[in-house]
């Protein structure tokens, strides 16, 4: 069909940390745009890719198989475009005749879009529709109830923790698992609920030394009562001082030889894999 309205060429780029479902969102946007008669463009390498003119047209078949593919086929970076890059971005938008920009990403994408739209009076090329689709395992974007990728990250974390529990339950053991999420405790909270964790430490309620000591006392008492496994989840930014190694040292020092302590960061596996059906 012939394009309607002023929009004819739409560019898609990823920005911020990787989130499962980024490819799915891009695929839907490309095919919906083509169905409306628009020319859909893919920007490789996020904002710096746009500044360097790494822009190519995406056809219907180019996004074949992206529906359940993990990663980000167009590439993504956490960089927020600096002021020095605005001129290059504006020129790239003009050269490629981009009528609208669709950004898929998390908090850094949000900050990047805000930085660009704040300068639209100085750079006429930025006076185009710019839309952000929230995609972040952290689920920390303003005005967004649930970002793309969050559900998959919770499933990934729960899957890993379940296997940790099977291993730890074989002997009396306290296990501390560190989740991602930056300064937002949503991923840690939901993973704790779904995995049945006894303790949870998040940035919103940063733990104190007194709380950790009291928790250690309660844990020792529970092991003396016959408990075989004690699971603790820790957000990666829960505390500036009390990280998982510190918690492990405290819990181990108070163990009285009744149990042993292990700790593990779940790491980037929370960002990987195919998106869940919900995402």
Regions found by a protein language model. Name each.
Residues 1-4, 50-99, 108-110, 137, ...:
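Glycine-rich oxoanion-binding loops at beta->alpha junctions
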Residues 3-51:
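N-terminal phosphate-binding or glycine-rich loops at protein starts, especially the Walker A/P-loop
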Residues 9-17, 22, 99-108, 176-177:
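A short, small-residue-rich loop immediately preceding and capping a beta-strand
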Residues 15-17, 43-49, 78-79, 106-107, ...:
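Short, ordered loop/turn segments at secondary-structure junctions
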Residues 22-26, 51-57, 85-87, 112-117, ...:
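Short acidic, glycine/serine/threonine-rich loops at helix termini
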Residues 40, 92, 100-105, 111-127, ...:
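Accessory alpha-helical/coil subdomains and C-terminal extensions
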Residues 259, 268-279:
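Catalytic, metal-anchored helix/loop core of enzyme active sites in primary metabolism
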């Amino acid at each position: 069909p012939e394009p309607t309205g002023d929009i004819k060429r739409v560019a898609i780029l990823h920005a911020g940390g990787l989130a499962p479902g980024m490819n799915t969102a891009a695929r839907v946007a490309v095919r919906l745009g083509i169905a409306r008669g628009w020319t859909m463009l893919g920007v490789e390498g996020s904002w710096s890719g746009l500044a360097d003119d790494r822009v190519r047209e995406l056809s219907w078949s180019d996004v074949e198989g992206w529906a359940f593919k993990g990663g980000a086929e167009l590439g993504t970076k956490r960089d927020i475009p600096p002021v020095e890059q605005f001129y290059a971005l504006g020129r790239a938008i003009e050269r490629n005749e981009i009528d609208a920009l669709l950004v898929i990403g998390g908090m850094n994408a949000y900050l990047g879009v805000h930085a660009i739209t704040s300068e639209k009076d100085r750079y006429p090329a930025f006076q185009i529709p710019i839309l952000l689709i929230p995609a972040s395992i952290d689920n920390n974007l303003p005005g967004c109830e649930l970002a793309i990728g969050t559900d998959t990250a919770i499933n990934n974390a729960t899957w890993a923790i379940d296997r940790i529990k099977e291993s730890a339950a074989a002997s009396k053991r306290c296990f501390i698992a560190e989740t991602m999420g930056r300064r937002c405790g949503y991923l840690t909270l939901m993973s704790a609920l779904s995995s049945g964790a006894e303790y949870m430490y998040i940035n919103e309620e940063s733990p104190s030394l007194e709380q950790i000591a009291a928790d250690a006392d309660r844990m020792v008492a529970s092991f003396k009562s016959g408990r075989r496994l004690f699971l603790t989840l820790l957000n990666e930014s829960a505390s500036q001082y009390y990280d998982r190694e510190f918690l492990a040292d405290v819990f181990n020092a108070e163990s009285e030889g009744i149990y042993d302590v292990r700790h593990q960061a779940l790491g980037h596996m929370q960002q990987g894999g195919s998106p869940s059906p919900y995402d």
